[in-house]
Regions:
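Catalytic core of membrane glycerolipid acyltransferases/transacylases, capturing the structured
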Residues: 1-39
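Non-catalytic C-terminal accessory region of glycerolipid acyltransferases
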Residues: 43-154
Length: 154
């Protein structure tokens, strides 16, 4: 795993106008770009594919939010399709201790970040999702409620 690559993060567009000044500052200054989750645009996917052709990596938060319930469900599965189209392996990253940050100082919290094992983009999308969810739940302690019945369209 090459750690010397720059990372651009896909972030929901609401974060760029968030009332939390620290969060807004971080999103704008740590290489994030806005994504409309309700109406994803083709230009977004073109940007992602161009980005991955360079020396950048892409950070995606498929959950779309922090979870107060510690349950992994309703995951945006498009990351599996992006991985396949870009021929880029998926590296799960679990963040534990970040939930409940709103209105509180992050400097008083213990946050653990675990970098997982790469998942081959050559696997079927459903298998990429399954392996990603298993690793994320292992690293975060979340309960996996992503069912086998969930389909990933190709």
């Amino acid at each position: 795993l090459a750690a010397n690559k720059k990372v651009a993060f896909m972030a929901k567009q609401e974060l760029f106008t968030d009332k939390n000044g620290l969060l807004r500052f971080l999103v704008k200054n740590l290489g994030a770009f806005a994504v409309n989750r309700e109406k994803p645009e083709i230009a977004t996917f073109k940007t992602v594919l161009e980005l991955l052709k360079t020396d950048w990596s892409l950070g995606i938060f498929p959950e779309g939010k922090t979870s107060q319930s510690h349950i992994l469900e309703n995951v945006q599965k498009g990351f599996t399709l992006i991985a396949k189209k870009a021929k880029a392996d998926v590296v799960p990253i679990g963040i534990k201790g970040f939930d409940g940050y709103a209105g509180k100082s992050l400097f008083k919290k213990h946050i653990t970040i675990t970098i997982g094992k790469p998942i081959s983009y050559e696997l079927p999308p459903e298998e990429i999702l399954k392996q990603w969810a298993e690793q994320i739940c292992e690293y975060t302690g979340y309960e996996n409620r992503i069912g086998q019945e969930q389909e990933v369209s190709q």
